[in-house]
Every structure is written in structure tokens, then in C-alpha cells.
Amino acid sequence: MNYLVISPYYPQNFQQFSIELANKGITVLGIGQEPYEQLDEPLRNSLTEYFRVDNLENIDEVKRAVAFLFYKHGPIDRIESHNEYWLELDAALREQFHVFGAKPEDLKKTKFKSEMKKLFKKAGVPVVPGAVIETEADVDKAVKEIGLPMIAKPDNGVGAAATFKLETEDDVNHFKAEWDHSTIYFFEKFVTSSEICTFDGLVDRDGNIVFSTTFDYAHTPLDLMIYKMDNSYYVLKDMDPKLRKYGEAIVKEFGMKERFFHIEFFR
């Protein structure tokens, strides 16, 4: 089996994936920006071959690297970066080289908050109202129909980056002034709960959950961003049956296969 890892060096705590794959007898190939000499010795020893590119952002350069490895080692069975930043690159390479896994079209349902909400609804999970924001008229409509307070985040984005909490008309005007009007936003009714729990785990290539667990967060992502706090969380010994029901329904609705999954809920 040929397993291609994109950016095997960074993040460093993910290097163990490559090391353990090699320990299982899998041929691990790597493409990254770092010089070969910079790779930690255990990682170097796990890679059958490492192809350095000048810029992982240059998809044509990366495709040429994949083509070379394909020619030298035979068909690539998997392409993974284990890094959210490179999801689109991973998907584009899989499509180009006909490799198992998520393709660009598949990412739409996990990268856009508006699309995720549609699937949450289909899975029977309670959600707060939301609206896609492309114009200032959309902003005014959301204020009228959803009502303040609301949370405003880029529709395509992760975490709490570029997030606005809208509680007053002044907050709305501030958002309009700061907004570049090209980034599509997603507004949602603000949830006052400070308790966040998660449904995390792994699915096999057929979409069956083979491991699941749950975390409780000490702080919300928004509080972490606003107050520059340190994050902490703990694993619960027992999972709330309602959380398991919702989590399993979401995983099934999204059609996840051979993936880690991480889903956050307000309690």
C-alpha cells in the first residue's frame, strides 16, 4: 500500500501517523516544503521517499511531485495531510489521481456552515436559525427575522476567526464597517449556553463508527478568542445518550468514511 502524506513534518505532533504507518509495513511517501535534513530522524526513517517542493500552495508543483512518486512507486492508495489547512489540496490531488477519499465537491458540506446546518436539520438535530449574508440588505433582513443577539462568522471558515458578536444596533453598524463585503458570512442566533460538549471518533472505510468519545470544554471558542484565555477540556467517562444519538445521526447524514470526526454541541 502506498500512502502519501502531505506536509509530513508539520504539525510535528502529527509525525507519529507516518511513523506508525511505516511500522505496519505501509510504504509512506511524503511531499513537503521543509528540506529533507530538517525532518526529525524518526520521521525520515519512516518515509520511503520525500519530495521537497518550494511551495505547497502551488498546486501545479505539488501535482508534478505526486506524478513523479506515482511513476516511481506505482499507484497511490491514500493521500492525507491530517491537517485542516490542506483539506482542499488533499481533495484536489485525490480527484486528479483517482485516489480513495473526499473530493473537492465532498468538502462543501463540511467547509460551509450553511451547508452543515442543512445536514444537521436532516439528521434531526436541533439547530438555531441562521442566514447567509452576502449584502447589507441580507444583514438588515437577518436582524429583523432572526433578531439580536446574533453571532456572525465567515460561512467558509474554522474556529472563531473573524467572528463578530452582534448584540446592539451599534454592533451591527460596526460589522458593516469592518466587513470587506466580499467574504460571505453566516449569521446565527446567539446561544447563551457556556457549556460545550463534543462527539469525537473514527469511522472505517464503510462509514461505521469504530471509536467514539466526548469532551467537555472549560470555555467556549468565542470566550477564548475575546479574552485570550488558555483552553482546557476533559474526557467524560460516560456519554450522554442524547449526545450519542445526535452524533451518530450526524455522522451517518454526512456520509463520513475513513475519517476522524469532531462535532461540537451546546448543552
Residue ranges and their predicted role:
Residues 35-39, 108-111, 158-159, 219-220:
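Short gly/pro/ser/thr-enriched loop/turn and capping motifs at secondary-structure boundaries
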Residues 109-192, 205-208, 233-245, 249:
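Active-site nucleotide/adenylate-binding loops and adjacent lid/helix of ATP-dependent enzymes
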Residues 39, 88-89, 141, 174, ...:
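Phosphate- and divalent-cation-binding pockets in alpha/beta enzyme and binding domains
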Residues 30, 101-103, 129, 152, ...:
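Hydrophobic residues in well-ordered beta-strands that form the structural core
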Residues 179-184, 191-233, 241-267:
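Phosphate-binding core of ATP-grasp and ATP-grasp-like enzymes
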Residues 1-105, 137:
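ATP-binding N-terminal substructure of ATP-dependent carboxylate-amine bond-forming enzymes
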